[in-house]
Amino acid sequence: SDLGKSKMKAPQKEERPDEAEFKEAFGSITVIENVFGFKQVLPLQEGDNIIGRRCVGNVIDVPIETSDMSMDRRHCIINVKRNKQGVLIYTLRDAPSLTGTFLNNEILGDKDRIRIEDGAIVTIGATTFILRAAEQESL
C-alpha cells in the first residue's frame, strides 16, 4: 500500500528555510520535556525575546507549547545583544510573571537583570529550559 511510503516523506516546513542558520545566529532555548509538554528547541533573536505559554492570540517571540497553567503567557524575557567586541550577551529578566522566574533555583527580583551563559537553567512555572548560546568565533 502507499500508506507506508507517504509516511516517509514528511512535508518539510517551508516557513523558515534558514532555521539552522537562524538557530546558530543568536542561540536558542531547549525546553525540557515534562508532564505538561514535550521537548522543544526554540530559536532566539536579537533584542528582547518574550518567552511564555503559547495560546491563541498571544503574540510573543518564543511561545512554548505546554499545558502548564503556572506559566504566564508573557513570563520572562531574554535580551540578546552584542557588546563592543561583537560577543553576544544574554540577559534574563522576569516579565513580570505571577509565579516568578528562577535561574538555577534562585528567584529573580522584579528589577533584576541577570547575565546568563550557555547552559543556564531557567524555570518558569513548572517548566524548565536551558539556554544554548550561539557558537561564537573566538576573536
Question: What residue ranges belong to the model's regions?
Answer:
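Intrinsically disordered, low-complexity acidic Ser/Thr-rich regulatory segments
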Residues: 1-67, 79, 83-89, 133-139
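Forkhead-associated
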Residues: 45-128
